[in-house]
Amino acid sequence: MAYAHVFASLTISTISLRRFLPRLHRNHSVKPNSRIICNLKLNYSAGKFREMGLSRSVELDQFITSEEEEGEAEEIGEGFFEAIEELERMTREPSDILEEMNHRLSSRELQLMLVYFAQEGRDSWCTLEVFEWLKKENRVDEEIMELMVSIMCGWVKKLIEDECNAHQVFDLLIEMDCVGLKPGFSMMDKVIALYCEMGKKESAVLFVKEVLRRRDGFGYSVVGGGGSEGRKGGPVGYLAWKFMVDGDYRKAVDMVMELRLSGLKPEAYSYLIAMTAIVKELNSLGKTLRELKRFARAGFVAEIDDHDRVLIEKYQSETLSRGLQLATWAVEEGQENDSIIGVVHERLLAMYICAGRGPEAEKQLWKMKLAGREPEADLHDIVMAICASQKEVNAVSRLLTRVEFMGSQRKKKTLSWLLRGYVKGGHFEEAAETLVSMIDSGLHPEYIDRVAVMQGMTRKIQRPRDVEAYMSLCKRLFDAGLVGPCLVYMYIDKYKLWIVKMM
C-alpha cells in the first residue's frame, strides 16, 4: 500500500477497559453499552520515522459508548481471536484475512481490534489496514469513525508536543487520507488550531509552508472536511485568521507576504484575509492616536511632536503599501473569480477610510460599483465626511449628487455626516452653510451638531464678514425655532466700546 512505507508503528502504553484486558482471553464478554476508556500512545520508529532513528509517543483519551440496551451482552467470538492471530503472523494480506472472517466479526469486535493493534509492542500498521478494509466494506459506523479520528488527532497532537518536523505531521495526514479517514471537519485546520493552542505559532507557519510545498511540488492535497474549503482561504488563510483573532494583525500580514515572496502561492482568499488584518491594524492605530490626543488634552501625556507625527505617517503609508501589494496578488490569483475583484476594492476602501485618505477612498467607491459590488449608503457618507474634513470640494460635489434622490431621513443622515466632516476639519463656514441648507430643506439638525457649528463660528470670528456670517446663522436658527433670542456681544478695541444686540 502507498502508506506502508511511511507510516510508523503506533502503540498503546496503557489501556483500561471495563470488559477488555490487554491480554485477551477467550470466553470473555463485553457489554455493548459499556464504556471503553483508552489511553492511546504512539511510538513511531517504522518507515521514514525509523530511518531517522526517532522515538516519540502520542497519547489521547477516547470514550466509546454503545447505543444498545443495557441488559444485552456480546461474547467475543472465536473469529476475533483467529483474526488477531492471522494478522499478527503477517503471512497474508490483512484485507484477505478480514474478508475471509467478515461474517464472524461484529462492530464491537472490530473496534476492539483497532484498539488492540495500537497496544505497545503491536504493529499499528494493522490499525490502518483494518480501518481501510472497514471503509471499503462500508462497515465504518459513527463509533468506529469517532474512535479512529480521535486516534489520529491524538497522534498529531503528540507529534506537535514533541516538536517533530512539519513534514512528519503532514505525512500523518497523508496516511489518514490514504485509508479513507474523512472526518466532518478539516484536519488541516485542526492541526493548525492545535499548533496555536499550544503556543507554537512559528511551527504552524512551518507546517503551512510544508503544505504549500507538497501541494505545488508533488500535488499532495489533504482536504478532509469543509473547514478550509468553506473559508476559501485554505491553510494559509486559516492561520492568518487565527493570528488576526488573537490580535496579531502584523503577523498575519507578514506571514502571507513572506510565503508569496518565497515563491509559494497562497490561495487568493488568503490575501483578502491579510487585507482584513491590515484594515484592523489601521483601525487600531487610529483608535490609539485618538486616545493619545484625548490624554494629551487632559494633560496626562505630552502632545505629539513633529518627529512622532512623521513616524506615524510613515508607518501608515508603509502599511497601506503592503495592502496595495496584497490587493495586486489577490487580483492576479483570482482572475477567474469576479467576486474577488469587488471584495478587493471593498478592503481597499476600508483601508483608506481607516487611514483618513478621502480621495483614494472615493476612487475605491466607484471601482466597487464598476465591479458590481454596491457599497452601502453609510460608506458613501463616511467617505464624504472624510473628503469634507479635507475640503476636497470636487469629491464632495460628486458624492452629494445622490442626495436629491433620497428620502428625508436618509437625506438628513447624509447631510449630518457632511456637516460633521466640515466641523472635524475646522471648516465652520461650510458647516454653517450645510446647517442652513438642512433647515431650508425642512430637516432639523441634531442639537449637538448645531452647538458644534455655533461654537466653531464663535472661535473663528476675526474679520467683519465672520461677524456677519455668525449673526446670519443665529437669525436663521431663531426663525426656524431652533434657538431662543440671542444676545450678541461685540467689543471694538479701538474705541473701547461694547455693542450688544438682541437677535
UniProtKB/Swiss-Prot annotation:
Repeat among keywords: yes
PPR repeats mapped onto the chain: 341-375, 376-410, 411-445
Targeting signal (transit peptide) range: 1-50
Keywords on record: Chloroplast, Plastid, Repeat, Transit peptide
Cellular localization per UniProt: Plastid, Chloroplast
Primary site of residence: plastid
Transmembrane regions listed in the UniProt entry: none
Gene Ontology cellular component annotations, sorted alphabetically: chloroplast
Signal peptide location: none
Superkingdom in the source lineage: Eukaryota
UniProt family annotation: Belongs to the PPR family. P subfamily.
NCBIfam families: PPR
Name of the protein described by the UniProt record: Pentatricopeptide repeat-containing protein At2g30100, chloroplastic
Species name: Arabidopsis thaliana (Mouse-ear cress)
